[in-house]
């Protein structure tokens, strides 16, 4: 039963079920995609978790992660949770004062820094973040001459963990079994637009629930691919890049760098893609440029068939059945033109395409719909563990953000504020009972207008 599941338990299940037979993670390094199986994923998490344990990490402790999307971010997050602790997300572009506040407020005692830039931030804050015991660096490039005793390196912590695993081979699994659905697995900080950021406590139950409910609406398979490039500190990326892949055992792919995201999307051809409006707008712009730069014959064909796609988009949006002739013409347009365009941009295999964080212009929605790509708007909040309201594939209405996920109760107050209830509603704000009491009165007060 899913009510007893946790992310650590899902990781263990996937490793036992798939072992080395299926890829769980890919990362592009030096131009080559490097693969990690489910067994490898499990071993990395085990090694880092036991390494943290050997440093003194105890149940309820926190690990902060500041860095770009890399497998080590997943390993650190799951390792903390396997030990009964929580991960704290820090955006890689956060300023020093933001980093200082989050580390201190969350009581993080270990910080995993993705690279030299992130490590330098934390080292600069040593005197004002006295609780931090170790700064664990993933990529030590440029840090050869650093000799601060607070520094440690990711691979060295994993090595310590492997040594402990050999001495106590059952310890890690015993720790996984001890993790409970009500355990806080993540403290995710709000933007702080109405004051200081508040730390939302997300439980294992919340994480599994949002993955389960998402999958009830948009089913995924274990052979699906996802490209992870939005910050781990954003709850939307947590849902699509951490919780859902663990729940359905599909692969997560990490781009080589921020500048190669679109190129790497083309290479992978994901089945699931979550992107903010700016990314969809950029792809749309690139499609239009490609059409304009095509040889005159192709450009002529594009110009003749694009109206066919737009007409089909109108039928879809107005929920009208197109005539058979129009439907056949649409298939011809897709086979001759749109499929090759989608393939060039890595969109051919897309089954579930999402946008969130801000509204996407209706003209962008319609352009992709004309090409056969159904982008769905999603609404959620940190306090609801990401999306709770989402478009359905067969019910996309540009004037709305969709309908609630199954088992999610949504109401509005007399003033139009949205209220939400369900298993995905967070436990409360860390060290802020007053704000928690204001937010949760049977239902979650989202502060958003319905």
Q: What residue ranges belong to the model's regions?
A:
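AMP-dependent adenylate-forming
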Residues: 11-36, 143
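Conserved pre-ATP/AMP-binding loop-to-beta segment of ANL
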Residues: 19, 152, 162-189, 196, ...
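Conserved AMP-binding/adenylate-forming core of the ANL superfamily
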Residues: 24-78, 95-100, 153-158, 204
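Conserved AMP-binding A3 loop
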Residues: 35-39, 177, 185-211
């Amino acid at each position: 039963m899913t009510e007893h599941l946790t992310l650590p338990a899902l990781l263990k299940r996937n490793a036992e079920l798939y072992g080395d037979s299926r890829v769980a993670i890919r990362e592009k390094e030096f131009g080559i995609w490097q693969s990690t199986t489910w067994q490898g994923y499990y071993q990395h998490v085990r090694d880092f978790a036991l390494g943290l344990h050997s440093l003194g990490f105890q149940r309820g402790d926190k690990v902060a992660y500041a860095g770009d999307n890399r497998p080590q971010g997943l390993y650190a997050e799951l390792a903390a949770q396997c030990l009964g602790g929580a991960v704290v997300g820090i955006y890689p572009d956060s300023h020093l004062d933001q980093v200082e506040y989050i580390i201190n407020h969350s009581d993080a005692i270990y910080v995993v820094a993705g690279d030299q830039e992130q490590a330098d931030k934390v080292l600069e804050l040593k005197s004002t973040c006295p609780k931090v015991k170790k700064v664990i660096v993933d990529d030590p490039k440029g840090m050869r001459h650093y000799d601060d005793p607070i520094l440690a390196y990711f691979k060295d912590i994993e090595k310590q963990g492997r040594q402990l695993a050999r001495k106590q081979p059952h310890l890690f699994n015993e720790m996984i079994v001890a993790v409970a659905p009500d355990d806080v697995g993540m403290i995710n900080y709000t933007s702080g637009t109405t004051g200081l950021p508040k730390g939302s406590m997300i439980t294992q139950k919340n994480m599994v629930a949002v993955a389960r409910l998402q999958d009830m609406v948009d089913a995924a398979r274990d052979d699906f691919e996802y490209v992870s490039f939005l910050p781990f500190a954003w709850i939307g990326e947590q849902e699509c890049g951490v919780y859902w892949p663990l729940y359905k055992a599909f692969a997560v792919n990490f781009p080589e760098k921020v500048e190669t995201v679109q190129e790497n999307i083309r290479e992978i051809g994901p089945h699931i893609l979550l992107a903010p409006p700016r990314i969809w707008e950029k792809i749309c712009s690139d499609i239009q440029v490609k059409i304009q730069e095509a040889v005159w014959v192709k450009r002529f064909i594009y110009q003749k068939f694009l109206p066919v796609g737009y007409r089909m988009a109108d039928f879809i949006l107005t929920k009208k059945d197109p005539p058979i002739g129009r439907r056949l013409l649409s298939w011809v347009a897709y086979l001759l033109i749109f499929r090759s365009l989608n393939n060039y941009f890595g969109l051919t295999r897309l089954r579930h395409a999402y946008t969130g964080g801000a509204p996407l212009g209706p003209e962008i929605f319609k352009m992709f719909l004309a090409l056969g790509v159904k982008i769905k708007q999603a609404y959620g909040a940190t306090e609801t563990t990401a999306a709770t309201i989402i478009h359905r594939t067969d019910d996309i209405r540009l004037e709305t953000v969709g309908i609630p996920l199954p088992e999610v109760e949504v109401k509005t107050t007399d003033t139009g504020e949205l209220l939400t209830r369900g298993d995905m509603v967070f436990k409360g704000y860390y060290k802020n009972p007053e704000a928690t009491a204001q937010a949760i009165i049977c239902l979650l007060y989202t502060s958003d207008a319905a």
